Amino acid sequence: MKKIITLTLAIIMVLGCFAGCSGDSYKEDTVMVVNGTEVSFDEYCYWLGYSASYLQYVYSSYTGSSAVDWDAASPLDENQTNFEWCVANTKETIVKSCIVEAEFNDRGLKLSDEDKAEIDETLKTAAENWCGKGADQEKLREYLAGVNINYDYYKKNLEMNLISNALFEDMYGENGEKLKEADVLKYAEENGYVNANHILIQTKDPNGTVEYSDAEIARRTELAKQLSDELRAISDTDEMMTRFAELKAEYCDDLLYRAKCTGCEKVFGIHKKDFDEGKLSCPNCGTANKADSFMYSDNAEGYEFAKGAMVEEFYNCCLSLKEYEVSEPVKSTYGYHIIVRLPLDTAKSIIDPYASSTMTLAATVADKEFSDMLDGKTEKATVEFVNGYEASSFKSMFTDSGFKLTSYKDYKASKESSDK
């Protein structure tokens, strides 16, 4: 599976910078120069428009309206106006993508025939999805132009995503496997990552539909103590872990199957035993749900996670344990946890409350190193507007109805007309 690298907080796709230059003689349509690489008017405006579109999406998500006051303080940075944020974000995107392409070329990397075929297939699919079955690339070009997207840069973005992936994999491996294990573990320990397994004995129904009696809660409390005592009495680690797995399979109340009910639309969970027996009804409304609507969460081997991913009582207990030490019952809002702390595993997927996707610990560290590398090179980059352009040159494209993309050809014609 290919990894998509995020070059900026707001923008996932990346821009490729084209031809290099030398001296101070720039092409007529050059707007900006990044480390000696020229950025054309159309390239710059394309990404300015993308930044504006993202900002409109943010407003729409929070207010229900995509209308933006470009002179108002930005919700993404209160120290900038919305227009200033778009300019700054565009600059950062362009600079980082220039750095990525330069690093890619310096390492002598090339996109494979498979990569190029993937781009062609993506363009073909886009044409059919947006323009109808059998639509060719000219139809796609026309469609994109109608929604303020330049076809050439759209295609270049697809290429740059693959360039980013290839650069990342060359530096770190697909999932960070090129990093030294000791370095990954050091980062994890310094940043509070924990690997642990648990047996959960719930003292309340997880779906909120059954009220446990005092007697049932007392029974479950005693059960948690018995399980903990049994495991803590086993001195041999292998024997203890084998018994832990047996007790977890028999007693753990951690729900393994979850689904959004097609009836009441509430998320509910069921145990593996109920799933295997076809007992798929929602406890809230009784609707029978299909098996393929459930998502399976395999937690037999426990969890590797960052701070904030688990309830505080669980996390703090993990920190207090030595490796392979079993805790006494730990009370949380879910019930009682019998926890065993495990050694960190660089190849295990982690639960990170601040991450948008699941990655291994090694991949997480590699992703951070890649981002830090880009940030460092961005800070040192030489960036300047040229040919008399400055940020305010593009302010007229930001209108009450949104960003109005202007091509260099039209901009030049309009400027020549106004100069007469």
Protein language model features and the residues they cover:
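Positively charged n-region of N-terminal signal peptides that target proteins for export
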Residues: 1-7
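Hydrophobic helical h-region of N-terminal Sec-dependent signal peptides
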Residues: 9-14
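C-terminal motif of bacterial Sec signal peptides marking the signal peptidase cleavage site
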Residues: 16-20
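N-terminal targeting/tethering segments
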Residues: 23-149, 420
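PPIase-associated folding chaperone regions across multiple families
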Residues: 23-27, 34, 138-222, 273, ...
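Second-shell loop/turn segments in exported
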Residues: 29-34, 76-91, 101-110, 126, ...
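Solvent-exposed, polar/charged alpha-helical surfaces in well-ordered, non-transmembrane soluble domains
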Residues: 42, 46, 88-92, 97-105, ...
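Peptidyl-prolyl cis-trans isomerase
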Residues: 226-312, 343, 349
